[in-house]
């Protein structure tokens, strides 16, 4: 390994990969599996609206808030140590979720799980980047994408089966067991850290976590309190100010939690944008469509989970295929742009959604979204990490995962709030809109409410499709190789200059 790293022991790289991949199997499963349990959780704990949505949003909020911090701490104090600490928090939060007596306790437990997930993801990504190089690194990150795809794919189906037969608490208990297995495995993983003294950028940590948390909290209150309410504008404004302060602090810090030179690299920024496009184009459908299918079409949790396999199954196989294509010479920028275009097309196509829609009608759009997600999932991390020197891989992995997790949190907060707001504009009742958005369409006006919910979905899908289309073009442009200077002879240069001046005159 390069001299920038100090190692305390050298267990096999295979064990490192296996333990990290177990983490990247469990965390996506926790995200996608929880989606099908939301209607049942709402019924059992008598919850609707923002409190119920927080079961999902709170997880992503803390995961994204702590991701960047976890990556930098991993570089300073040890990547394995942060990975293991994340596993402890994740398991504790999952156990708390399984035993929660009310929605408030469940929300708190889910936010704790999110903080743990940040340590597992940022520490795990940094461990892979520090352990593997070159084509082996590409294969390792492709395997990571494949495992994430497996978690996404089996999460709704497994959770749907357990929710229907055993209850949603068993789902969280399973996640707690997985967290403990990750913790045990971490003791067999090599430790690595950057060769510099541990110094924590406390102002940077505080301003980043506080800013992102306040911003997300304000957005989640939009539908219930009104977008012009002080309950929304206050936290959003305070969060934005703290994030501006974070940038100012990082510019002056000798040991920043985020070295801003990372995002000055146009190609690294391009891969971060590609990472953001994935949750924008897929997370809203993955999280909220099962609620629509259960509430409007009357599907069981198990059947809704099986339907989502049409989206999640491609993510099982395509990350590894994407990595192989890049290793065989296919330009990564073309693959990334194609993937984001597929996300755009899939969301536009999904406007075929209507009450009584058949699974066959959903096959095309869900496959398009799944293929777009899978193609790019296996190449983003490896391509981005290849642009970063070894001493900053933890910070870079943390930032990249912050973009992914923050994108997920923002997408869920915005789509959840916008769906509820659009339904409320049609029903005139915030309470009724919250119940409809949570999948509760019981009552004599069920058909009318289903139509209103569907109209709201269509507006959201068209908006997401437009964002992804713009994102695809931007990603392709940012990832373009730098133009090579053309050597021109002195005589030809003088001739060209003369022609240019003549043309201007």
Q: What is each of the regions a protein language model found here?
A:
Residues 1-12, 441, 445-450, 478-505:
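Intrinsic disorder in cytosolic terminal tails and internal cytosolic loops
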Residues 170, 192-195, 209-235, 247-248:
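Phenylalanine-glycine-rich, low-complexity intrinsically disordered regions
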Residues 13-29, 34-38, 49, 55, ...:
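12-transmembrane solute porter fold
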Residues 164-176, 221-232, 300, 421-465:
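A membrane-interface helix-boundary motif in multi-pass transporters
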Residues 67-204:
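Helix-loop-helix hairpins in multi-pass membrane proteins, especially solute transporters
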Residues 57-58, 111-118, 169-180, 235-239, ...:
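Structural signature of hydrophobic alpha-helical transmembrane segments
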Residues 194-199, 255-261, 427-430, 482-492:
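Short, Lys/Arg-enriched, Gly/Pro-containing loop segments at transmembrane-helix junctions
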């Amino acid at each position: 390994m390069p001299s920038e790293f100090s190692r305390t022991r050298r267990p096999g790289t295979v064990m490192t990969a296996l333990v990290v991949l177990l983490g990247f199997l469990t965390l996506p499963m926790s995200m996608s599996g929880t989606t099908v349990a939301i209607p049942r959780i709402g019924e059992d704990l008598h919850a609707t609206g923002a409190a119920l949505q927080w079961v999902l949003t709170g997880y992503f909020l803390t995961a994204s808030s702590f991701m960047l911090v976890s990556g930098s701490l991993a570089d300073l104090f040890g990547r394995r140590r942060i990975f293991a600490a994340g596993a402890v928090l994740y398991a504790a939060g999952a156990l708390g979720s399984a035993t929660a007596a009310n929605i408030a306790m469940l929300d708190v437990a889910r936010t704790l799980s999110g903080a743990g997930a940040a340590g597992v993801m940022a520490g795990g990504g940094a461990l892979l980047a520090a352990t593997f190089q070159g084509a082996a690194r590409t294969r390792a990150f492709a395997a990571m994408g494949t495992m994430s795809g497996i978690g996404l794919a089996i999460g709704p189906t497994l959770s749907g089966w357990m929710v229907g037969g055993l209850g949603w608490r068993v789902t969280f208990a399973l996640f707690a067991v997985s967290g403990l297995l990750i913790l045990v495995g971490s003791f067999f993983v090599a430790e690595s850290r950057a060769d510099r003294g541990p110094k924590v950028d406390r102002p940077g940590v505080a301003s980043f976590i506080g800013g992102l948390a306040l911003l997300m909290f304000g957005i989640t209150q939009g539908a219930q309190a009104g977008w012009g309410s002080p309950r929304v504008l206050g936290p959003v404004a305070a969060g934005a100010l703290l994030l501006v302060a974070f940038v100012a602090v990082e510019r002056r810090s000798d040991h920043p939690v985020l070295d801003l030179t990372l995002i000055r690299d146009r190609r690294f920024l391009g891969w971060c944008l590609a990472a953001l496009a994935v949750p924008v184009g897929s997370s809203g459908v993955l999280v909220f469509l099962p609620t629509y299918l259960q509430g409007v079409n009357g599907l069981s949790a198990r059947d809704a989970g099986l339907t989502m396999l049409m989206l999640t199954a491609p993510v099982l196989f395509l990350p590894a295929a994407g990595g192989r294509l890049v290793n065989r010479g296919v330009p990564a920028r073309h693959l990334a742009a194609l993937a984001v275009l597929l996300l755009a097309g899939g969301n536009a196509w999904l406007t075929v959604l209507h009450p009584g829609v058949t699974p066959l009608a959903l096959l095309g759009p869900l496959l398009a979204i799944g293929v777009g997600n899978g193609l790019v999932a296996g190449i983003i991390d490896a391509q981005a990490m290849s642009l970063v020197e070894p001493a900053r891989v933890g910070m870079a992995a943390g930032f990249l995962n912050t973009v992914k997790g923050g994108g997920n949190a923002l997408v869920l907060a915005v789509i959840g709030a916008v769906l509820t707001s659009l339904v409320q504009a049609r029903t005139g009742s915030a309470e009724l809109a919250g119940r409809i958005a949570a999948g509760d369409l019981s009552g004599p006006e069920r058909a009318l409410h289903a139509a209103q919910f569907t109209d709201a979905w269509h507006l959201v899908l068209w908006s997401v499709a437009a964002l992804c289309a713009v994102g695809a073009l931007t990603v392709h442009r940012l990832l373009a190789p730098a133009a090579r200077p053309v050597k021109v002879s002195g005589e030809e240069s003088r001739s060209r200059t003369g022609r240019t001046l003549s043309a201007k005159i």
